[in-house]
């Protein structure tokens, strides 16, 4: 057996360069590049290997480990999981920063390869800089925290262990049914150790992502169930997008006259204008989808995990039977469903062929539901502040709105701004979101005029994903305009990769909605009987000792200008229109700082969310919220 002598890190780089995926006959390199923040735990091992011979890997310099790993996740998501980025950090805090990203990837079933440096395998210099010492187990390091949030975890304590570790890593990264974060911990001494690796380990490997076919028995079960129902509703999940099954999905819906609703991950797979597309469903869903969902006698979930936001905590369609088509048996088995374990496209096509001349019993309900929602959408886009103004989320901070108006010098509403942005940006532009009130507004209001232009991380709803995610999307779609839709709370959490976008000359656009607070959580607490408590951004009041002083006003445009972005301060609809048009002309990243009044986001449309309301309280409003929760639980599925 012929061998080649390399360090562990050099062998890793060489191996990654020779990994390919094949899907529907198309073959491409799997690992496009690697994000790096070098420290003592990885610079002399993996850093040396990348400097000496990176091969075809593109090497990027991150600014925050979570930020760069989030960018890697967004890249893979936008590439429909067919190509990935890796990310490497040093030991200690750098590695710990990526734990949140690992959880984000795993929650969303998005492949990402994380390569944190680790403490010495030999233990000779222990305790090294940034090492945590556990008196009961010296083998534990910061990197063990990744175990709970990774789909595959390994630690390479000897050079020869790299081979089994990486083959298993590729197994998980290329498995549509069970992909997510893969963490390979690399002790800093082992990275530099040499070994005679078999040359066969570095041969070109093609990992075929095959379309799992459904069993004949499961197809028969599905057909029997559908034929027994009059008003089925399809739920379009992210699996349809990742399977690249949009055309098959549309064909299925049209052939059998079955309307469909979208999850956050599924939205944008098919244009919003399709006559059977009801839009977002569930807690952040709209009036049309939730109305039809309550009438449906069968829910057909395709490529969806059926999270609580999709099912409205299992209350939205509690009496309907459930059919699932999912490549993951785990997800297919949810809600005690009749399950078809298969690739989305393969499953839909097999069922369609066997279903024959079935047609649903829907009449005008679908078009009427869409028309009603379109009227509501027009109203939301035209909401403007004025005399006797009532916000969408009424009864919370109504009396404080004049104070916000004066502090901001703005009367803009969040729904009005979203409508204008949707109107003016390019049809093929990609929007990116993750947290706060914006995911609800966008799932309800955003009209996708082109496919794959809606990129929402809502499996983990990671604050700080938006800007790093926009950068990752831009690397995946360099010819498109990309917009991060972000609130002020999330911007403050993490915006480090703005600098990386400037460094790389990859323009992204930040649409910053500043309502000076954690608005959606303020809604949640006040809707459940609490007051406004530590969710508005207010200064400490020396008289009360509470955070109920003056509203904090931050010039985010100045912050971004300091980094080198082209920025705009927006207080009127005219200024917004000018900024959106001018930002398209720029060649560098832009930020539009928009002051919007609180409580002007959308409200729920016939849905309920099960949250942990206090059972005991001195406040009648909290007691009422608890009673309401208990009443809604009676209407929900138990499992």
Curated annotation (Swiss-Prot):
Coiled coil: none annotated. Thiamine diphosphate binds at residue 65. The keyword GTP-binding does not apply. Its EC number is 3.7.1.22. Pathway: Polyol metabolism; myo-inositol degradation into acetyl-CoA; acetyl-CoA from myo-inositol: step 3/7. One of its GO terms (cellular component) is acetolactate synthase complex. SUPFAM superfamilies: DHS-like NAD/FAD-binding domain (SSF52467), Thiamin diphosphate-binding fold (THDP-binding) (SSF52518). GO terms for molecular function: 3D-(3,5/4)-trihydroxycyclohexane-1,2-dione hydrolase activity; acetolactate synthase activity; flavin adenine dinucleotide binding; magnesium ion binding; thiamine pyrophosphate binding. InterPro entries: DHS-like_NAD/FAD-binding_dom, Myo_inos_IolD, THcHDO_hydrolase_firmi, THDP-binding, Thiamin_PyroP_enz_cen_dom, Thiamin_PyroP_enz_TPP-bd_dom, TPP-bd_CS, TPP_enz. Binds 1 Mg(2+) ion per subunit. Keywords: Hydrolase, Magnesium, Metal-binding, NAD, Thiamine pyrophosphate. It catalyses: 3D-3,5/4-trihydroxycyclohexane-1,2-dione + H2O = 5-deoxy-D-glucuronate + H(+). Its cofactor is Mg(2+); thiamine diphosphate. Signal peptide: none annotated. One of its GO terms (biological process) is isoleucine biosynthetic process. PANTHER family: 3D-(3,5_4)-TRIHYDROXYCYCLOHEXANE-1,2-DIONE HYDROLASE, THIAMINE PYROPHOSPHATE ENZYMES. Involved in the cleavage of the C1-C2 bond of 3D-(3,5/4)-trihydroxycyclohexane-1,2-dione (THcHDO) to yield 5-deoxy-glucuronate (5DG). This is 3D-(3,5/4)-trihydroxycyclohexane-1,2-dione hydrolase. The gene is iolD.
